[in-house]
Amino acid sequence: MTAQTPIHVYSEIGKLKKVLLHRPGKEIENLMPDYLERLLFDDIPFLEDAQKEHDAFAQALRDEGVEVLYLETLAAESLVTPEIREAFIDEYLSEANIRGRATKKAIRELLMSIEDNQELIEKTMAGVQKSELPEIPAAEKGLTDLVESSYPFAIDPMPNLYFTRDPFATIGTGVSLNHMFSETRNRETIYGKYIFTHHPIYGGGKVPMVYDRNETTRIEGGDELVLSKDVLAVGISQRTDAASIEKLLVNIFKQNLGFKKVLAFEFANNRKFMHLDTVFTMVDYDKFTIHPEIEGDLRVYSVTYENEALRIVEEKGDLAELLAANLGVEKVELIRCGGDNLVAAGREQWNDGSNTLTIAPGVVVVYNRNTITNAILESKGLKLIKIHGSELVRGRGGPRCMSMPFEREDI
């Protein structure tokens, strides 16, 4: 890595040097049962304990020599001038689906009144309850303002933000600034936009952009895996479609980031398997976790770039042999989440037993609750760093979901 290339990620397993997290904040306390589906949650974490668990996760990474960055801090540091700060507020408001001109004006005044940049960023993440706004004089109300709604928010919270893996993905020296599956999460990508445009270290064109949030087709970082300096893996999933992958790959190949091939994994389209990294992660040079339920229906395509066009071939045969051939190792072992017990596999996959974060070859961060999968991983010689996640897991994401590497050592 040099001063000109502040992002450097050419594997899933190289020693992790720098990582981006988001500490859960007040956005979690703006979850309520009636609107969980709208906000892509199944349950409501207890914020105080979720923060303790997240702080312990961050400390476990620091204890292994990883520098921990925070999304909210980098975003605040990106508002480097009053003009950029105001532009951020206006763009945030334009994407917030605010009903009513007078309401939008009141929220703008609220945000402009917040002097501290980090406090401003955290407020935009938390959302705005209607009860926080002053009463709007009747003469200033438009029709939309006058038609009362029982919905309690003027602006929705962004409770999924602690899953920093998804709004953008680091790939080599570049970044994919994603267009996400849902309106709820697509708003999250504004922070990445300002970081990679205006931040003193990461902005100013220092990081090549291989996908843009203004695209119309969807892709999320949980479906983008860097297997080696030559090979990427992408998932065609509930959250990522094939058209997005084609756009991403053309940009990656055209910008000469060094990658020679992409393996595209097509698997079941449902919330249980929302991303590739919820069912498949790399934990060592020759070892992967996998959820056994996807193996039967999995289809894999090899994609290369020849004569300024994508060349796509459906792969047949054994997945382990395919991975070994592409990674240049003699043999690859697929370690099943939950072992051979379908009940354990289903339970532990739901609790992100397959969603591991590798911080060095064979050194893996996992939730301690997935005892069967963890015992199997340890029996294969892997060193596990076990973290508590009883509250964090309620958002349906594990250690990989909660982290975005900015720098890894090459392998």
From Swiss-Prot:
Which catalytic residues are annotated? 401 (amidino-cysteine intermediate)
Which superkingdom, per the lineage? Bacteria
**Pathway(s) it belongs to:** Amino-acid degradation; L-arginine degradation via ADI pathway; carbamoyl phosphate from L-arginine: step 1/2
Q: What is its EC number?
A: 3.5.3.6
Per UniProt, subcellular location reads as: Cytoplasm
SUPFAM superfamilies for this protein: Pentein
- What's a single GO CC term here? cytoplasm
GO BP:
arginine catabolic process to ornithine; arginine deiminase pathway
User: What GO MF annotations does this protein's record show?
Assistant: arginine deiminase activity
Which reaction equation describes what this protein catalyses?
L-arginine + H2O = L-citrulline + NH4(+)
Keyword list (alphabetical) reads: Arginine metabolism, Cytoplasm, Hydrolase
Family according to the record: Belongs to the arginine deiminase family.
What name does this protein carry?
Arginine deiminase
This chain's source organism reads Streptococcus equi subsp. zooepidemicus (strain MGCS10565)
